[in-house]
């Protein structure tokens, strides 16, 4: 029984330490492994001067903590692999 428990503990430690890190999108089709200590993926969107013609600016990445929310900026954070895909949006001229 002790051997089984010890084996489970060792396997758990190995899986946690060498899991390879969280995978987040950094661009529309660019997943990357986050650096150690950065255990969240985020999606940040906002309108700039070209929002009417190009749509919102989108920034994707990894973070240790969810970025601070600022007025006019939408931020979502998540903690599973590839949980921050590039938002599917229509071009402004395709909107009803």
From Swiss-Prot:
One of its GO terms (molecular function) is ion channel regulator activity. Keywords: Acetylcholine receptor inhibiting toxin, Disulfide bond, Ion channel impairing toxin, Neurotoxin, Postsynaptic neurotoxin, Secreted, Signal, Toxin. The keyword Disulfide bond applies. Residues 1-21 form the signal peptide. Its main location: secreted. PROSITE patterns: SNAKE_TOXIN. Expressed by the venom gland. InterPro entries: Snake_3FTx (IPR003571), Snake_toxin-like_sf (IPR045860), Snake_toxin_con_site (IPR018354), Toxin_cobra-type (IPR054131). Disulfide bonds join 24-41, 34-62, 47-51, 66-77, 78-83. GO terms for cellular component: extracellular region. It is found in: Secreted. It comes from the Eukaryota. Potent long-chain postsynaptic neurotoxin. Pseudo-irreversibly inhibits the nicotinic acetylcholine receptor through competitive antagonism. Belongs to the three-finger toxin family. Long-chain subfamily. Type II alpha-neurotoxin sub-subfamily. This is Alpha-elapitoxin-Al2b. The lineage of its organism: Eukaryota, Metazoa, Chordata, Craniata, Vertebrata.
